[in-house]
Design a protein with these regions (language model features):
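Intrinsically disordered, low-complexity regulatory segments in ankyrin-centric signaling systems
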Residues: 8-36, 45-48, 64, 68, ...
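Conserved ankyrin/ankyrin-like repeat signature
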Residues: 29, 61-62, 94-95, 124-125, ...
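Ankyrin repeat domain, specifically the short helix-to-loop turn at the C-terminus of the second helix
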Residues: 31-39, 64-72, 97-105, 127-135, ...
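Ankyrin repeat boundary/linker residues
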Residues: 44, 77, 107-110, 140, ...
């Protein structure tokens, strides 16, 4: 019994060390813990993997070390988020490029990396996705598109980029919600004017 408890606490302590190392960009400790046998696919109670945590931080050395241990790159947490989505919303362009090179998916059901990037105005990340053929008018379960999110969050540059690549300005969610409505509800007047000029309807 004592040995089992000791092993449990030892594992928990090692996991905390790993989380701290990822947050601090301590690549040496990350590498050491992996070499000692920590499972690279270890997740927390919300299903967030070590790779997802590293993707949020954007430290390339740590990210590459974790990737060298062959984690599940396309894994999703309990909220349907991937490592690529987390790198996208933070605007970590190099991390995004590296994850794509390792097989991360640009498009999948539900929220997409493009939507995450658009909501935070991560224009360079968005451009990369669009150049690589991301589905620009893809909608999540409630019918929101990247354009609607950009309009709602007041992200003018993101909105203009999406329009440049041909986003449909008049798409409606199942409940009738449009990008123009999103802009008006949040008093994003400049975006509303841009959408109206482009022919958007409520």
């Amino acid at each position: 019994m004592g040995l089992a408890v000791t092993a449990l606490f030892t594992h928990a302590a090692a996991y905390e060390d790993m989380l701290r190392a990822i947050a601090n960009g301590d690549n040496g400790t990350v590498s050491s813990l992996l070499q000692k046998g920590m499972d690279v696919n270890t997740v927390d109670k919300e299903g967030e993997s070590l790779l997802m945590k590293a993707a949020k931080e954007g430290n390339m050395n740590v990210l590459k070390t974790l990737l060298s241990a062959k984690p599940k790159v396309a894994a999703l947490n309990s909220f349907g988020e991937s490592a690529l989505m987390m790198a996208s919303i933070k605007g970590h362009l190099e991390a995004v490029k590296t994850l794509l090179a390792e097989g991360a998916q640009i498009d999948h059901a539900g929220w997409t990396p493009l939507m995450y990037a658009a909501s935070m105005n991560r224009v360079e990340v968005m451009r990369l996705f669009l150049v690589r053929g991301a589905k620009i008018d893809a909608a999540n379960a409630t019918g929101l598109t990247a354009l609607m999110l950009a309009a709602r969050e007041g992200q003018t540059q993101a909105l203009l980029l999406l329009m440049e690549y041909g986003a449909n300005v008049s798409t409606k969610a199942p409940n009738g919600y449009t990008a123009l409505q999103a802009a008006k509800q949040r008093n994003n007047d400049e975006i509303a004017r841009i959408l109206v000029k482009a022919g958007a309807k409520e």
